[in-house]
């Protein structure tokens, strides 16, 4: 029976191995016994073994994080080994050095260091002890050259020359009452600023002449010629009391035809075409069934269409034998030959809408060209102040060498979409040629750039330069030329600036 019982137990429990529940129970009893012997308590609230395991895992994890962080920081900010770095800077003092052969030379600026090495490298930061371990040479480079190179060449190049006439709301910056501001970038046209269109105009004076500024150009006008003033909606006082214009704005604005009584060739002579209603110089008026009357002028070999305002000017001039227009029916006018001999583009279609300079003391000449276009756009902006956003006004830089004569810029501002690597182009809207290359700093200085592949690559100026009219660039103070020959120069001392300005330190 006992043997039979053992057989039954063997068939029911297999080999009699321990189950998982028995093993975990045994381990629990062992840990409880160890805790009873070591801590004199059997409540399993804290297990020392598990705490030790967690401590080891946490320590290993922290060590790995520290090692990975150190590795990453070594790439971001290396410890500073000179090795073969061509341009070196002292990590503590920031002093700049250029490496030529086995000798370090103190460099005046980054432009000089790049031109000497021929590479557009940034300074490699090292410890001063490493710099002291190498032989040194004298000071090298171009005095006054820039150290900041972040070239920008937008698709649309935009430049402005602005005059701000001193008044109750503007502080006079110039003894002549005009502040000249150069703006590189897109103007801000909010805040009652407007682009002059149609009959909009500004009347300013330069020297002894008065000028009507509209449609991107200036036209001279005589304050004593009432036959022209009245149709234009101007008074002699508006012209004689016009506020001054700077030489910079005067040069930037292309000159247009003078606003005078149009000079008619062979005035008073007999017209040579059949059916002429009168001699040369006769003003013709043609009634229309719908719309305003049409005016024309009899010339030697035909008739030229006149704007009503020009017809009024000719009538005001009181030419002999032509005191009033001659009425010609449309059917008769249609048989007369049409010519276009007189340039009447300076005259508006309607009386001028003159901007009040007291409310709009700022006048800007705006030059703009987009890449791929054959012509530039020239417009005039008028407003209460220069076209700079209010929150950007603190970025307008007052130039140290502002001459306050209106021949150079007094202020400069780099606005949105500014260009700092430019090629000079002509002032003519159709100009396609590009000449010298220039690098501009946000302090308002311009530096000529040697037009060679080596110099441009060394300075990191590989992009295509934006066009910029010379009439604007010449208003900025000029710095030295950035060339390799000028950079390969040693100095014991540097010349002193003979016309510095005092730095005012707030108390």
From Swiss-Prot:
One of its GO terms (cellular component) is plasma membrane. It is a single-pass membrane protein. An ATPase. Part of the ESX-5 specialized secretion system, which is responsible for the secretion of EsxN and a number of PE_PGRS and PPE proteins. The chain crosses the membrane at residues 56-76. It is found in: Cell inner membrane. Keywords: ATP-binding, Cell inner membrane, Cell membrane, Hydrolase, Membrane, Nucleotide-binding, Transmembrane, Transmembrane helix, Transport. It comes from Mycobacterium marinum (strain ATCC BAA-535 / M). Pfam families: T7SS_ESX1_EccB. The keyword Thylakoid does not apply. Gene3D superfamilies: Type VII secretion system EccB, repeat 1 domain, Type VII secretion system EccB, repeat 3 domain. GO terms for molecular function: ATP binding; hydrolase activity. Coiled coil: none annotated. It is an enzyme of class 3 (hydrolase). Belongs to the EccB family. Its EC number is 3.6.-.-. This is ESX-5 secretion system ATPase EccB5.
